[in-house]
Each structure stands twice: as structure tokens, then as C-alpha cells.
Amino acid sequence: MDHLPIFCQLRDRDCLIVGGGDVAERKARLLLDAGARLTVNALAFIPQFTAWADAGMLTLVEGPFDESLLDTCWLAIAATDDDALNQRVSEAAESRRIFCNVVDAPKAASFIMPSIIDRSPLMVAVSSGGTSPVLARLLREKLESLLPLHLGQVAKYAGQLRGRVKQQFATMGERRRFWEKLFVNDRLAQSLANNDQKAITETTEQLINEPLDHRGEVVLVGAGPGDAGLLTLKGLQQIQQADVVVYDRLVSDDIMNLVRRDADRVFVGKRAGYHCVPQEEINQILLREAQKGKRVVRLKGGDPFIFGRGGEELETLCNADIPFSVVPGITAASGCSAYSGIPLTHRDYAQSVRLITGHLKTGGELDWENLAAEKQTLVFYMGLNQASTIQQKLIEHGMPGEMPVAIVENGTAVTQRVIDGTLTQLGELAQQMNSPSLIIIGRVVGLRDKLNWFSNH
């Protein structure tokens, strides 16, 4: 280990930055956030430093560097574009046994600045020892996405509860289980964010008085249409906390690779006309695992409430008094159209969008007359096997045969395929595509040639 990670208490302590440009400004923000009593020395300053000085937040010393500026300092930073001056600042600091950071010159510095994830009072620092700042930044960004924004408020509140929790729970194991409940409680986090004192008190009392062998819970998470980058931040957090993940075939391998490694994985994939696991059995799997006290994530492609049977699954849980919540996902209509260069609405072509299931059943006839109207976009989910029927019905009810159509296969994935044509060709086009596919019908499809950005990447 070349560097010892430490956290410095700098509040109301003298610190010095030598440099008045953009780099120095970024360092100054960090020291000001830490409460340091900051002096900045340079020949000239960018406007932000002047604004801070006018607000009484720091002291500016305009002119050449003088070593006496270090006399009362706890910490210094050399942030100029003059290597010789930076070296001089570093040597002067070292002679006084003051830690000094030299920007972009870790070998000349006595301390280096890590990449920081600030969820105060919770802080995470990431460093490559100065060898690869870009790698440290990328790792910080990954960790940033895993840590909820409200985590700091929860940590601060937890500090206020420590005394009571120690009195309430006799053993370390009981206290640990309580803290685990508190730190994943979304209602408490939201109440803290809103400063809702009544809800904070109610939720805290419920958590403290709730038996430790409490029921599990189920979270319905929308995984989006395929591209792992479209998974929401909250969705990622949920799959990282899950004990069990119940998923279907529309969830990509890239997203499954983000699931907590020691979580149990239950595949319940389904295809049109063929169910690997009957829906009722899926409902029972969710119920059974939650009743064991586990945190269960039901991970679905797209959005769980748009042709995802999410409502059916939640009704089962509700009837059994199992706690549940829902994390929406980007639905296939939105993702596939965007990655195909097809805007679902457009002032000139479509003032509304209809999302329609392609599972056409006897006795469940659609309102084809309204679907055939102009100035709208139709999006058929799971409609590949019914493409010829869709074509026939729309034409019969007055939609022009030259109406533009597109079929998107594996939308948003690197294997995405898009084929377009007219309504009279829809049945023929469908024979060239495989599931999962989405059918888009409307004048907006005609914009694809101009707006298609994804295939060009």
C-alpha cells in the first residue's frame, strides 16, 4: 500500500491553495465543503474566486507565492500551470511538515486527492494512487450509481437513533437486523428527504416495534427493453439488494450480470403461445419466497405494468398481505422507437400513441375502426404472429395501405434489427423477423431515414 487512506477534519483550520484558475477552483470547492478556513494565492483569479471572497468564504492573496503563507496551515495544494512553482510550494510545505498535494504530479506530493462519493456523513473515496485517474473516476461513477442519493440523510438519522436502538435490542445480532431494515426502508428515506417529521416518527416506531422475524417483500422492477444502460438507478439498487431474483427471457444477460452475486436466480421465461412457467406458478414462487422473509425482486423486461402482468402478480401478494413496491422501467415502445429513430408523437403526424397487445383472442376483438384513424401512432406488443391479421383489419377499417410500418427486433440491444415498409407489406415483413419484436404503425415511421441514429453508431 503506497498511500494510507485517511479522512481529515479541516473545519475552521487554515488551508492554502496556490493557483487561481479552473483546477484550483475545483480543489477550493472541496476544501470549502469540508469547512476549511481557506486562503488562495495567485497572480490572478478567475471570477468564481472573487465571488467567494466577496461572500466572505475565503481570503485572496494576490501576488507571488510567499512561504510565510504556510506558517499557520494544516494542509496545502499547489494547483498552478507552473511546474517549478508547484515544486517550490511542495518543498516549502514539506520543510514545515505540512501535507501538500501537487495537481497532476503525485510524485511531488505528500498526499493525493481521491475520487469522492459524497453522501455525508457517509463518504467513499476511490484512488488509483495517481497511476490511473480515469480508472478511479470510472469506478467512482459505478459506485455512485449503486448508492442511493438519500443515503446520507439515512446515515445521519441512524446516528441519532443509536442510543435508543442499543436500549431496545439486547444483542448485536438483533441490532444488526434492525439496521438492515432501516437502511433499505424507502418510506423512511423519502420522509427524511421531505422533512416529514410525522412520517419519520411513524416509520421509525414501526421499524423499532416490528418483530425481527418480519415478512419478506417483493419488488417489481422494470428492466427496460434490453440495453443495460437503460436500467434505472433505483432498479439497479434493488437487484443489488435482492435475496431472490425471479426473471424472464426478456431480461438481458448484461442486466443479469448486475444482480447481486449470491442472490438466488429463478428463471420463469415465457414466449408467445408457450409458457415455461404458468403465471399462477410464478405468483406462488413470489409468495413462497417472500413468506420465507426474503427480499424478492421480480425482474421484468420493459415496464412491469405495461403488458407485464405486474398487476396480476401484485394482487396475489396483496391478498396474502405481503409487502410490495414497484420500480417502473422504460417500456419497449419508448426504448425501441427511440433507438430506431421513430418519434412516437410529432406535431405534424401523431397527436396520440396507442399501446396494444398483439395477443388477439377470440371474443376480445379490438376497436379497429378507432385504431385505423389518422394522426396517431400504433405500437403492437407481441404482435409478430398476428401481423397479417393486424394488416387485414386495419385496411378493412380504412387505414391506407401505404401507411408506414416498422418492426423492431431486439430493440435497444447491439443485435437490434429494424425493417420498414408499408401496411400492405406488414404480414410479409413479419415473416423475416423473430421475437421479441415490436410493430410500429403510423406516419412517424417515415421519419426513420432521417432520424435513425443508433444503427449509424
From Swiss-Prot:
Name used for this protein in its record: Siroheme synthase
Region (Uroporphyrinogen-III C-methyltransferase): 216-457
CDD domains in UniProt: SUMT
Positions that bind S-adenosyl-L-methionine: 225, 301-303, 306, 331-332, 382, 411
Modification sites for Phosphoserine: 128
Gene: cysG
Species per Swiss-Prot/TrEMBL record: Escherichia fergusonii (strain ATCC 35469 / DSM 13698 / CCUG 18766 / IAM 14443 / JCM 21226 / LMG 7866 / NBRC 102419 / NCTC 12128 / CDC 0568-73)
Active site: 248 (proton acceptor), 270 (proton donor)
GO terms of molecular function: NAD binding; precorrin-2 dehydrogenase activity; sirohydrochlorin ferrochelatase activity; uroporphyrin-III C-methyltransferase activity
